[in-house]
């Protein structure tokens, strides 16, 4: 489903763009979609776009992660149907699965100050403000990315930027499969 949007990222308003609601997808399908939209955005053929979806169970390994950070054995992963993907985003390892809302903003930062760290903080701020609407006291932890409720991470963040256009984003645990 595609909708126009006008939203706030931190204290900044995204003037206009598209919101794609993509249902549940394999990670590699969503990654290919991100790459395609990012390329179109870099070429200024489309406006800023935000993709919302869920993934089938998988681990993604960012630039600072490694397979050795996966605690489950190959047999368990296979039996549970959990795939593993290496990615070009920042961060370590992240589990994705049903019950987790994933948001992939594909935004040209040239119109927003070209500050990647501020962008990352702004994405966290959107989640923090959203949690507040549900009376959940979420916040940041010094030295740790993402959004936290106490000592528990409720949203994992990992991004990459190419030609000032963002990819990847943030994954919010709404009602994830706790057995994973």
Name what the model sees in each region.
Residues 68-73, 154-179:
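Short, conserved beta-strand/beta-arch hydrophobic-aromatic motifs that form part
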Residues 81-92, 168-180:
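Hydrophobic transmembrane alpha-helix bundles
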Residues 1-149, 153-154:
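N-terminal lobe of the biotin/lipoate ligase/transferase fold
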């Amino acid at each position: 489903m595609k909708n126009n949007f006008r939203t706030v990222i931190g204290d900044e308003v995204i003037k206009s763009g598209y919101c794609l609601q993509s249902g549940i997808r394999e990670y590699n399908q969503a990654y290919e979609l991100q790459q395609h939209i990012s390329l179109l955005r870099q070429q200024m053929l489309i406006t800023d776009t935000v993709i919302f979806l869920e993934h089938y169970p998988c681990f993604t390994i960012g630039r600072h992660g490694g397979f050795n950070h996966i605690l489950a054995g190959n047999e368990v992963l296979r039996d549970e149907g959990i795939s593993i993907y290496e990615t070009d985003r920042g961060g370590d390892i992240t589990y994705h699965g049903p019950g987790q809302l994933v948001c992939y903003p594909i935004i040209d930062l040239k119109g927003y100050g070209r500050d990647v760290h501020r962008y990352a903080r702004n994405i966290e701020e959107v989640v923090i403000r959203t949690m507040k609407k549900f009376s959940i006291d979420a916040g940041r932890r010094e030295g740790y990315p993402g959004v936290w409720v106490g000592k528990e991470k409720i949203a994992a963040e990992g991004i990459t930027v190419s030609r000032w256009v963002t990819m990847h984003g943030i994954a919010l645990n709404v009602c994830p499969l706790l057995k994973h």
